[in-house]
Amino acid sequence: MERIIMHIDLDAFFASVEQRDNPKLKGKPVIVGGTSGRGVVATASYEARKYGVHSAMPVFMARKKCPYGIYVASRHDRYREVSKNIFKIFYEITEVVEPVSIDEAYLDITNCGKEPLKVVDYIKKEIWKRERLTASIGISYNKFLAKLASDWNKPNGIKIIKKDMIPDILLPLSINKVHGMGKKSVKKMNNIGVFKIEDMYKLPLDLFIEYFGKFGLEIYEKIRGIDNREVEVGRERKSIGNETTLRKDTKDIEEIKKYLYSFSKSISKGLRKNHMWGKTVTVKIKNYKFEITTKSKTLKEYINEEEKIYIEACKILDSINIKDPLRLIGLTLSNLSEIKIEQLTIEQLMNSQRS
């Protein structure tokens, strides 16, 4: 049986919540994420996107493109509350749900016993009825094509991609539409005269392996409409972390460590709340030139205590040669486990074998 995979993307989610909660913002260019000019755009409303504003753009650039935009601070607790209510709708349809982020999910509706378009109609109506928000939905026989379809008719769109539509749909597209093709990969392809999937389609498999390594086969198959990835139910959280843009650029290590301490406290709180521990500590810095450096350390034991997280973060920071003033600092704990796995010493191991 051919799978029926659905990708649901809530439209300009953070900005849409702000516009819904404050009717005065309706129809206006709303930019969520930073109000100081030193932050980064989390989400821009569709009205703001017309000016070229997009997520991950520095706020100072957004202000140049959209000087009359309305800049709103993020309210993550509010967004999580709304997201939770919407995800309940997905679970009413099927248990095979893979949350990708707070505003995005895959559903496998192959065995739910309902017509795909009726499922789409129900989901859209319920999201609007319960939260007065819209979503764009893509349907296909695999995850790659379902996501591609959900991007097709934004906002509030629906698109179905069937097997017999693949040549007409895929071949004319730019190669940056292929999930997994980052800026560097696109540039590599552009340098050899490959700009569209149609150009890429003509390349032999060994060239994909040469250019993309272990991802070569995956990309080769995707542009042929092949993607065997399953919808991952209950996908485990892989990391927890925080980052922030500093109020002003600084090389003051003690000032930077204050941020690491604050992050360590919030990370520890989140881990303990979910009864989790982590093993890999990563510090991320961005200087005033927007150059990013990340450095990680995998520990011998799992930790979730704020003091231990902070100590390891400081060790990593001290090992980085910081030449220029920083504008951003981040801290992440990954390699998570719901059980604190202890590393036994040889003596402990011998004792356990004797008992």
How should each PLM-predicted stretch be described?
Residues H7, N190-L328, N335-R354:
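DNA-contacting surface of Y-family translesion DNA polymerases
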